[in-house]
Amino acid sequence: MDLKVLKSEIFEHLNNKIIPFWEELKDENNGGYISYVGFDLKPDPYAPKGLVLTSRILWFFSRLYNQLRKEEFINFADHSYKFLIKSFLDKENKGFYWMVDYKGEPIDKRKHLYGQAFVLYGLSEYYKATQKKESLDLALEIYKIIEEVCKNDVGYKEEFDEKWNPKENIIVSEYGIICERSMNTLLHILEAYTNLFTATYDQSIKKKIEDLIILFKEKIYDSKTNHLYVFFDKKMNPIIDAISYGHDIEATWLIDEALRYIDNNKLIKEMSEINLKIAEKVLEEAFESGSLLNERVRGIVDKNRIWWVQAEALVGFLNAYQKSKLDKFLKAVFELWEFIKDFLVDKRAQGEWFWKLDENYIPSPMPEVDLWKCPYHNGRMCLEVIKRI
């Protein structure tokens, strides 16, 4: 395989597999998109609709239009945007609810920074596609809330009630602990700010991007292991022995993307070198049989192959190859794509990607769509490959 063949195959996969799957889920009766498809590929039109999935679908169709320029994609983005504003937006207290029922009535009014970040990411992309001032105004309102309500002197508070009173950070916590701060949420704030900056070129946002990159360099990156810490206390001290290989490799290319828009040459050089070290460590430690292991927690390695981890690994290793010209990264890209085609893509006519494979590559009976299983990772993988090659 060479890069031209890779690009051609991924373009075909995006257009013939991923896009039609998500277009089919447009909910014409209740708004938004059907938010649950079981392992049996049966959609549940009565399933609750989540902020993360709704925002990611908005981002996906907006980015499709911005990159591939097909008018149909705007219609699908509009559909997601209208439901997001009608059902998730808290007009009284501002911000967006975590979850609504299938008709759009709020059933979980918590505000989580992770969810607000994806609203910001989606609205910024939608504004680029449509130039609708309302969408940009909302994006800037969310940005202002994040900076004025969530931020403190050592990072960002993450979970709140509907009136923005801080709560225990339950939504993104794992491994039997409750964290105050998470690398995952901070990464998606950086990602969202980068997208907002490229929609506005507001210089104040550029400064916040730089501050977040410094936070990654000084508090989140572990120079002893070349991994990223996962969970922190409120002072940004790491609180668990855990490595998320998927987040490590995803962070390398998202941070490299953010580095393009700051002016601090010393930071650009240092962080770019760190990102390459992280990519090399992930390749060395977690790349096995053409695919990426999931995580290591308290010394125990989880060898399941998760859909989003493989998608982010392909982009991350392609980015590392384009920076370094080291053949080992390109080899990993080609092997990952073969693995994805052979094992992760659901070859049933109505299927998309399996959520998870066990260490023998047998699909786990998990949904193909739910509040987290979305077109953001694998759809973006396709779009990044098409853009970069």
From Swiss-Prot:
Alphabetical list of SUPFAM superfamilies matching this protein: Six-hairpin glycosidases
pH-dependent activity: Optimum pH is 7.0.
GO molecular-function terms, A-Z: cellobiose epimerase activity; N-acylglucosamine 2-epimerase activity
Temperature dependence as stated in the record: Optimum temperature is 70 degrees Celsius.
Keyword vocabulary terms for this entry: Isomerase
Biological process, per Gene Ontology: carbohydrate metabolic process; N-acetylglucosamine metabolic process; N-acetylmannosamine metabolic process
Keyword NAD tagged: no
Swiss-Prot/TrEMBL catalytic activity: D-cellobiose = beta-D-glucosyl-(1->4)-D-mannopyranose
EC number(s) given by UniProt: 5.1.3.11
Pfam families linked: GlcNAc_2-epim
Keyword Isomerase attached: yes
HAMAP family: Cellobiose_2_epim
Function description: Catalyzes the reversible epimerization of cellobiose to 4-O-beta-D-glucopyranosyl-D-mannose (Glc-Man). Catalyzes epimerization but also isomerization for beta-1,4- and alpha-1,4-gluco-oligosaccharides. Can use cellobiose, lactose, cellotriose, maltose and maltotriose.
UniProt record similarity statement: Belongs to the cellobiose 2-epimerase family.
Quaternary structure annotation from Swiss-Prot or TrEMBL: Monomer.
Protein name, UniProt field: Cellobiose 2-epimerase
